[in-house]
Regions:
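Accessory cap/linker subdomain of secreted extracellular hydrolases
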Residues: 84-145, 210-322
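C-terminal, loop-rich substrate-recognition/catalytic regions characterized by aromatic stacking residues
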Residues: 278, 373-661
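Short beta-strand/loop motif that positions the catalytic acidic residue
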Residues: 323, 329-331
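Alpha/beta-hydrolase fold nucleophile elbow
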Residues: 187-199
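Catalytic-loop region of hydrolases
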Residues: 15-113, 137-139, 443-490, 660-661
Length: 661
């Protein structure tokens, strides 16, 4: 019996709410489109802020100004953005958007650009401008010209700030607390501070809020992570080689650019230079060794601490249960931090409305893509303004009635709910079956996905390959940069499926919804002492397009699960297995023996439309999204890997169907 019956969505208490914000959303938009309260912006460049250990951070301070450019005297709430990408990046974005002709042209082009294949990915990238993401990344002049002071600070050890880059560590978190305190005591401050920003800046805003500085009153984190190892550094024990090398190289390169103005004025900072000479390439030696070492015994202690779970990552994971200030989290199902974003929201102990979650369908480099269009949420900059107007200025604009959970339902459209996962989800096994589905002749193997256990035993073999470079996995793993390859790569798995095992269900007859995390359980056999497994869950359209809706991976020797941190569904199966991902709990595989592995997939929300099918893809590699660490890769010998399909030890996917099926 296949997946051919009905899945009915159970409406939640707020399912009729409008993802656009309705009349309130129009009010928020109007607030950003009308003439600003102040005509100008005054910028004070490279303001020194001295930390408790004597290290000096550099900040740009943007204040409301009159027509002559002179800062107004009135006190205002302030918004903080701490960045490792240098204040220069925000300045460049601000400069481009603040020139009337240029900014208007960019917005017009971004709103109208709709390129056909193979250039459709370019339209996704430009959507960050039309959707307001660029304003949140840079300086939001709408905020400043409407009575806010915005402060952009180079994180310790980056940009023009002194010190060694701490990469979201405890000292950097203390810096955030001290900068907030400094801001609240300035003559231009009314004592209320908010935090905003994208990615790294969003992470340190979540960290700061968990440390409860008194002056911090609200945060607006866009694409924050909170489990950096499982999010992107070492998902399932596989290094994120599509992102980490490029990211570390970029930040370390940017931090070496000196303050040319200070040099010209004879004010060059020798302490800045000393710190750069002391640590020119933070974490790069560790990254290289993690990729190239052939034996664990050859790995240095500094590399081990970033290659496995432990104190390094515990220090960088915020206790979101401590957060007491209003928090609006924006994320995306295909973001590199998709694992963390719903967890952050669910972990905050605040009433709905004071905490909110928006999950889009984009990638890390496309925040806000599609926002502001019919049926979609307001632009990100509009939401940011409304959020701070409410919680920093006390304006009754209804933003607390938005959401509280606004999601792009993959396969459908934007919906609003009162929780994620949505109520009414029931986990059910769908079994991997060797019987051909007749839908994937292009795949290395075309199997089926059934409600009943397979009656015939089979061993299926899959070998590592490189087709992941043109896949949804690859696009997510490069933070969305490879979306330029077009939807035939990013939104259709058929190219990658040529080197994968596919298991496809029967076509559904009515809309069938699923909501929450998913687990893929495999009974495996290896010919070496290690191996690597990657899996995706896909929505297969009648025309054959195989769209990935979630993914996951696991190094076979790191399969040990910490049950104290894992979740099981009512049927007794894992819905969210939490792997230790430590060397001490590593279990080399015995070649030839059947070994069970559970692969936790990213949380998701999706609907299969009538005629569509559910598919599970299984691969022995998915580069560049994941690459096994050097010693594990060496132990695998890149040999083919096998899945055992049998009634007494079945392989299956545990799926959260909403309202049954």
């Amino acid at each position: 019996m296949g997946l051919c019956v009905v899945g009915l969505t159970v409406p939640s208490a707020v399912a009729s709410a409008d993802p656009t914000g309705g009349s309130d959303g129009q009010t928020w938009l109007a607030a950003t489109e009308t003439a600003p309260q102040y005509p100008g912006v005054s910028v004070e460049w490279d303001v020194p802020i001295t930390m408790s250990d004597g290290t000096v951070l550099q900040a740009n301070v943007y204040r409301p100004a009159d027509a002559s450019g002179r800062a107004v005297e009135s006190k205002a709430p302030s918004v903080l953005n701490i960045t490792p990408y240098t204040k220069l990046l925000g300045t460049l974005v601000d400069s481009a958007l603040s020139i009337p002709q240029v900014g208007e042209t960019l917005m017009d082009v971004a709103n109208s650009l709709d390129l056909a294949a193979p250039f459709d990915g370019v339209s996704e990238l430009t959507g960050v401008i039309a959707g307001g993401g660029a304003r949140v990344l840079g300086v939001n002049r709408d905020l400043v010209q409407n009575g806010y002071t915005q402060v952009v600070v180079d994180a310790r050890g980056t940009g023009f700030s002194q010190g060694n880059w701490d990469v979201l560590g405890k000292r950097e978190q203390q810096d955030s607390v001290e900068v907030i305190d400094w801001m609240s005591k300035q003559g231009w401050s009314d004592g209320k501070v908010g935090m905003a920003g994208i990615s790294y800046s969003a992470i340190n805003s979540v960290q700061a809020a968990s440390n409860n500085p008194p002056a911090l009153k609200a945060i607006f984190p866009v694409e924050p992570g909170n489990d950096l190892l499982r999010d992107i550094v070492g998902t399932g024990g596989g290094l994120g080689v599509g992102f980490m090398p490029l990211w570390l190289t970029a930040v370390n390169g940017l931090k070496l650019i000196p303050n040319v103005q200070d040099i010209l004025q004879g004010n060059f900072d020798p302490l800045w230079l000393a710190s750069r000479l002391e640590d020119p390439g933070t974490l790069i030696p560790e990254l290289v060794q993690a990729m190239t070492a052939q034996r664990i015994e050859d790995v240095s202690p500094s590399t081990l601490q970033v290659a496995q779970d432990g104190q390094f990552y515990q220090d960088r994971s915020a206790d979101v249960g401590n957060i007491t200030v209003p928090t609006m989290v924006y994320g995306g199902w295909h973001d590199i931090f998709a694992n963390s974003e719903p967890r952050i929201y669910n972990g905050i102990d605040l009433p709905a409305g004071q905490k909110q979650l928006i999950m889009g369908n984009g990638y890390h480099v496309t925040p806000g893509g599609g926002f502001g269009k019919d049926g979609a949420p307001p632009r990100l900059d509009v939401l940011e303004r409304a959020w701070f107007d409410k919680w920093l200025k006390g304006i009754d604009n209804g933003i607390e009635r938005y959401g509280p959970v606004t999601m792009f339902q993959q396969g459908g459209g934007w919906i609003t709910d009162d929780q994620f996962p949505r109520a009414g989800a029931t986990y059910e096994r769908m079994y991997l079956n060797s019987a051909p589905s007749g839908t994937a002749a292009h795949a290395a193997y075309d199997g089926s996905l059934t409600s009943d256990q397979p009656s015939a035993a089979a061993r299926l073999t899959v070998a590592p390959g490189l087709r992941g470079f043109c896949s949804g996995d690859g696009t997510q793993g490069t933070a969305g940069i490879s979306v330029v390859l077009g939807a035939s790569c990013s939104k259709d798995s058929r190219f990658q499926e040529a080197e994968g095992l596919t298991f496809t269900g029967e076509a559904v007859t009515e809309p069938t919804s699923l909501s929450g995390p998913i687990n893929v359980h495999l009974e495996t056999v290896l010919d070496a002492t290690d191996g690597f497994w990657a899996a995706t869950v896909n929505d297969v359209a009648p025309d054959g397009t195989s769209t990935p809706i979630t993914n996951g991976a696991l190094t076979a020797s790191l399969r040990a699960v910490d049950d104290s941190k894992s979740t099981r569904s009512a049927n007794g199966d894992y819905s969210e297995p939490h792997h230790y991902l430590t060397i001490d709990t590593r279990q080399p595989v015995v070649p030839g023996e059947v070994t069970a592995v559970d692969i936790n997939m990213l949380p998701t929300d999706a609907v299969l439309q009538p005629g569509h099918r559910l598919r599970v893809d299984v691969y022995a590699a998915s580069v560049p999204r994941y690459l096994a660490l050097g010693p594990m890769l060496a132990d695998s010998q890149l040999k083919p890997q096998h899945i055992e399909l049998a009634a007494d030890r079945p392989s299956f996917v545990n799926v959260p169907f909403v309202g049954g099926r």
